[in-house]
Amino acid sequence: MFGKTDKMDVRCHSDTEAARVSKNAHKESREIKGAEGSLPAAFLKEPQGAFSASGASEDCNKSKSNSSADPDYCRRILVRDAKGSIREIILPKGLDLDRPKRTRTSFTAEQLYRLEMEFQRCQYVVGRERTELARQLNLSETQVKVWFQNRRTKQKKDQGKDSELRSVVSETAATCSVLRLLEQGRLLSPPGLPALLPPCATGALGSALRGPSLPALGAGAAAGSAAAAAAAATAPGPAGAASQHPPAVGGAPGPGPAGPGGLHAGAPTASHGLFSLPVPSLLGSVASRLSSAPLTMAGSLAGNLQELSARYLSSSAFEPYSRTNNKEGAEKKALD
């Protein structure tokens, strides 16, 4: 008798528990359906992979395994994946999925013109100026503030792009100039003069340094000697002796104009013919001085010009090549 009563009690308790579980399940299904109805259609069509498992969902899963009811901060929703099957995911209740997106502010042409003018005047508009500008343009202060922030960001980006482009252009120009200088140095010989004056290069400077050409002086030696002899014959006494003195100073008399003394003997007369001076003794002394040290003067002038050319080439793109060429040329000239 008592055993049957116990069995009946157990059976009643099990039926009561089953009814309670079914009621809870029905209530949960209603909540799920309500949540599904409130979600937008685009959200329901998204696959399950679009939602990553966060720490909150893991906490919700742990709490679900521990207790039959979900905590207050969890939200269970149903999502239809790409295959059409419905899956259940758990998200925090703080995630507001129903909130509409913020609309993008569209400015009119007049508003943009006024905002741009104010930005050119002052990049930071605060306080009363911003309030007055927003009132005049029929905008809120937040819209004006956000527009100025975006405009400053755009200006910084543009400045960065401009500086980068400027650096690229300057580097390209420098490279082109260096290549042009290298090409000029390869096609043209570097400026310079030899150490000795007689085999000097052609040009205005060389002709000025040389003065009368050497063949002309040599050719005029015969005429100079004849004129000197005539002057010695006509001049009486000491004048004839004075007129014969310059050839002796210039050098020993040689056989004809091509001899060693031909150049020095013809030099006073050539100078006399050029400058038309009546004093042959003065011309003879000047010619003797010039003929005594032509190599030293030529060497000093050529050395100075070589130094100037080296300084000029030191600022060019082919500096190493010019320095080596100058050194080799100087060594060869010193050996000669």
UniProtKB/Swiss-Prot annotation:
Biased composition (Basic and acidic residues): 1-34, 325-336
Entry keyword set: Developmental protein, DNA-binding, Homeobox, Nucleus, Transcription, Transcription regulation
Ranges in a coiled coil: none
DNA-binding interval(s): 100-159
Protein's GO biological process: astrocyte differentiation; axon guidance; brain development; camera-type eye development; central nervous system development; glial cell differentiation; negative regulation of neuroblast proliferation; negative regulation of transcription by RNA polymerase II
Start-end of Low complexity biased regions: 236-250
Subcellular location: Nucleus
Region Disordered, annotated ranges: 1-39, 50-69, 236-267, 316-336
GO CC terms of this entry: nucleus
Keyword Transcription in record: yes
Alphabetical list of InterPro entries matching this protein: EMX-VAX-Noto_Homeobox_TFs (IPR050877), HD (IPR001356), Homeobox_CS (IPR017970), Homeodomain-like_sf (IPR009057), HTH_motif (IPR000047)
Family: Belongs to the EMX homeobox family.
Function: Transcription factor that may function in dorsoventral specification of the forebrain. Required for axon guidance and major tract formation in the developing forebrain. May contribute to the differentiation of the neuroretina, pigmented epithelium and optic stalk.
Annotated protein name in UniProt: Ventral anterior homeobox 1
Native source species: Rattus norvegicus (Rat)
Organismal lineage: Eukaryota, Metazoa, Chordata, Craniata, Vertebrata
Gene: Vax1
